[in-house]
Swiss-Prot record:
This protein's encoding gene: infC
Organism: Ehrlichia chaffeensis (strain ATCC CRL-10679 / Arkansas)
Biological-process GO terms, alphabetical: ribosome disassembly
Origin: domain of life: Bacteria
Protein name: Translation initiation factor IF-3
The keyword Cytoplasm is assigned to this record: yes
Length: 173
């Protein structure tokens, strides 16, 4: 069975190798430069840990506090910040040049739902066969989409033609 190992970035208690340290007590009062034995005995006297905060060449800065409590609260902060992050998903809707009114309305409702959830929506309008000879009809469909979603969405970039496809990305206002 594997056990999860926590990587300590700070040296604690007997792991500190310096002979003398700058000591800050549990009330954040600077004690000054003391021997490591005295610092360890002060920490043990109040049932707390001696933690090396800043490693300095001459005297490392050490503080007396409950390291396990600090580690727990630090993990909790990290997990809370991960929960609050929202990943933006890019959804894609594909249109054709000869789309019917009902099909257009269904896709428009899907687009509205994606935008209201906070997703970006990539619109792809594909030309098939000789339809490529009439790109202005495709641009009319794209402009109609922009007009119909103007209340909740805005184009992230202008519609651009890449080969036989016109692409555009819509985002929430």
């Amino acid at each position: 069975m594997k056990t999860k190992k926590f990587s300590n970035k700070n040296k604690i208690n007997e792991m500190i190798t310096a002979k003398k340290v700058k000591l800050v007590d549990q009330n954040s009062v600077m004690i000054g430069v003391v021997d490591i034995e005295e610092a360890l005995s002060r920490a043990k006297a109040v049932n707390l840990d001696l933690v090396e905060i800043v490693h300095d060449d001459q005297y490392p800065l050490c503080k007396i506090f409950d390291y396990s409590k600090y580690r727990y609260s630090h993990k909790k902060k990290i997990s809370d910040s991960k929960k609050k992050q929202k990943t933006i998903i890019v959804k894609e809707l594909k249109f054709k040049l000869n789309i019917g009114d009902n099909d257009y309305n269904v896709k428009l409702n899907m687009l509205r739902g994606f935008i209201e959830r906070g997703d970006k929506v990539k619109i792809s309008l594909r030309f098939i066969g000789r339809e490529i000879l009439h790109p202005e009809v495709g641009m009319e469909i794209i402009e109609r989409l922009i007009r119909d979603t103007a209340d909740i969405a805005k184009p992230e970039n202008l519609p651009k033609k890449e080969g036989n496809i016109i692409n555009m990305v819509l985002t929430a206002k």
